[in-house]
């Protein structure tokens, strides 16, 4: 069984994604979940760490990074089940961007 450590634990303390990943690796974890609270500023560092660090991204929690218009951790800011069509469409777009 593989145990993954979530970036939810330390993403708020880091502006640089590489430093965030290194902190988790230094605790002995090699499987990492990318949490919904990641910001655009984390992405370049995470991608750079993929080239230099020994870890696997085991899962993605919701879409990421958080949309720039969302100022706090809000994993349910755009729901697929929303009664508002615009919110449902935004959830789909953000999820597709995450997958790409």
Residue ranges and their predicted role:
Residues 1-97:
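N-terminal pre-domain/capping segments
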Residues 100:
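Divalent metal-binding pocket/active-site signature
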């Amino acid at each position: 069984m593989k145990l993954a450590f979530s970036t939810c634990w330390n993403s708020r303390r880091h502006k640089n994604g590489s430093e965030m990943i290194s902190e988790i690796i230094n605790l002995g974890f090699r499987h990492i979940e990318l949490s919904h609270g990641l910001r655009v500023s984390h992405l370049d560092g995470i991608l750079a760490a993929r080239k230099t660090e020994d870890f696997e991204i085991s899962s993605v929690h919701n879409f990421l990074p958080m949309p720039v218009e969302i100022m706090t951790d809000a994993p349910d800011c755009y729901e697929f089940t929303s009664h508002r069509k615009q919110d449902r469409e935004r959830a789909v777009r953000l999820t597709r961007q995450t997958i790409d």
